[in-house]
Amino acid sequence: MAFIAALGLLMAGICPAVLCDGILGRDTLPHEDQGKGRQLHSLTLASINTDFTLSLYKKLALRNPDKNVVFSPLSISAALAILSLGAKDSTMEEILEVLKFNLTEITEEEIHQGFGHLLQRLSQPEDQAEINTGSALFIDKEQPILSEFQEKTRALYQAEAFVADFKQCNEAKKFINDYVSNQTQGKIAELFSELDERTSMVLVNYLLFKGKWKVPFNPNDTFESEFYLDEKRSVKVPMMKIKDLTTPYIRDEELSCSVLELKYTGNASALFILPDQGKMQQVESSLQPETLKKWKDSLRPRIISELRMPKFSISTDYNLEEVLPELGIRKIFSQQADLSRITGTKNLHVSQVVHKAVLDVDETGTEGAAATAVTAALKSLPQTIPLLNFNRPFMLVITDNNGQSVFFMGKVTNPM
């Protein structure tokens, strides 16, 4: 299973900005910040991230009622947090408040240090799962930006920085797209289809997650089956299946849905939410951070006699400059934008926010001793679910088990 996302913020201004050429390292968090960054506990950051995740999901789902939805709230929020480093006053407050931070209870410094430690932890190599996340600034070559902004993006967000000539739009576009393609292993080959020659700076954030199921599906068991788009339409899909699987499960009768957790090797898991036929909108409208917490807290190991899950690969492409104002981020897109902590003057505004995500789900996984032991140890549990069939639209949430941060959230309405 692989999840890949990239987000690009395109900034235009009267006077272009530049950053000295160079690669900014991943291990340069100043020593004096090491202790302070932990003031914002990872679980606190995760709960805030969940609130933003669900708000954005509802906007995207409303705009795309019958379409697949997939996005990375962590990638989007990290990019916006970096942008807020360069913003002042009400421009900054808008961004952080939409990210669900209460600025009367937490300082701006704590927010950025919390993000910094989270991203630094995720960038550490892990035996079982591949996680690659990072940010990059592409700056026009005409004029320096403030060294303080350069230092903070490097230290807190591990951002790389490159010089680009945006007067040569096609060359600059290829430069940025090639970088993103390389970081996402070719999964996102073209983040930008076009660039404006007035562009002064592009901020890119990417997240690549490759996880292997703790208990994999056997490819030999995959078969062709119906997936019901609605009550009248269906499509043929490759359907994976596995029998006698012991995994966390809950039936939510109040919201008319079943919730299943599948674990990856390593420190991540996927929550699959299967609404009853015709109940998708009811479940979506009821989604709150408390809902996800209730499901997580109520999950109990159950034996699924047979689990069926479609094999699929879907991709999405969003222009978030149309969505973020609906959530409350407006000033960065206007001439009233104050991004003066980037350049020293109020000469920048955001003209484009592009987010692309790719979600691949297949049988891949590796059987390990721990998985076999867990399955065997829990066989004595009395409750058995006869058949759980994901043959209609469903949602999924991919989280980091250590900090509960949401890597990806999506809705699959058509696997093909």
UniProtKB/Swiss-Prot annotation:
Region (RCL): 365-392
Glycosylation (residues): 102, 182, 220, 267
GO MF assignments: serine-type endopeptidase inhibitor activity
Lipid biosynthesis in keyword set: no
A GO-annotated cellular component: extracellular space
SMART domains: SERPIN (SM00093)
Family indicated by similarity: Belongs to the serpin family.
Record's function text: Binds to and inhibits kallikreins. Inhibits trypsin but not chymotrypsin or elastase.
Name by which UniProt lists this protein: Serine protease inhibitor A3K
Naturally occurring in which organism (per UniProt): Rattus norvegicus
Gene: Serpina3k
